[in-house]
Amino acid sequence: MGSRDFSDRTGALMTFHLSETRGEVYEHKEKTGKRPADWLSSIGFLNERCLAAHSAWLTIGEVRALAKAKASISSCPVSNMKLAIGGVAPIPEMIREGVNVTVGTDGSTTNNSLDMFGEMKTLALLQKSSRWDPTVVKAQEALDFATVNAAKALGMQNEIGSIEVGKRADIVIMDGRSPTLRPISLENAVSNVVYSAGRGDVRSVLCFGEVVVRDRVPQNLDIGSVIEDGQRAMEAISANKA
């Protein structure tokens, strides 16, 4: 059974890398005669349960195919720049055509910090710089990519992504006294979060209403033990390679 058939039967989401590098686009076109997104569209694979990671080397036609299928994409700008893929996801065109845009970190080997605050800022700045236009990807749009749009990509927009009556209390509480967030007002709060804040400004975190981080201290794990376990694992891997 193919992945699309399985998804249709179970409602499972489908995530995959799409047009991350120019080389993979050329290789796919040589094999199939079509660019990756065009080919996926032609075989009826794309739908609202698809989340296409990267999507850096897309034509406007492919963007429209994703929009028509109600698919989502997850741009990973820090990883893309670290790997020097050369492409920049056409985010303004995606927004215009109605693609559900999200932002992601990719894996730790190609991103390292996995910092979603840094990812929002980098995405916005990369789009502005590559377009020579400081007005593209506004701060609110960048925040939406990481919250409400991400919830929609997971099919969970009625449960998470925003603070509303009836939704789960998945909440990140920032330290409003942090110098990086000051001065602050209703007018600049979102901009401060996207362009000035970092993960060090997170004070507490709630998941399903349960406080899992309180005053920067994880409540359900021993962070020291986790760090030591990671160190020992790295040393064991290094020893095996020697």
Question: For each predicted feature, which ranges?
Answer:
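Short, solvent-exposed cationic patches
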Residues: 227-242
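His/Asp/Glu-enriched, well-ordered alpha-helical/loop segment
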Residues: 38, 42-49, 92-178, 183, ...
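C-terminal cap of metal-dependent C-N hydrolases
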Residues: 168-227
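Alpha-helix N-cap/helix-start motif
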Residues: 29, 33, 83-87, 110-113, ...
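Histidine/acidic residue-rich metal-binding segments in metalloenzymes
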Residues: 1-72, 84-101, 118-121, 158
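Generic beta-strand/beta-sheet core signal
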Residues: 17-19, 53-55, 74-76, 102-104, ...
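Short, acidic/turn-prone active-site loops that include or flank metal/cofactor-
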Residues: 20, 77-81, 107-109
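Flexible, glycine/charged-enriched surface loops at secondary-structure junctions
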Residues: 15, 160, 240-242
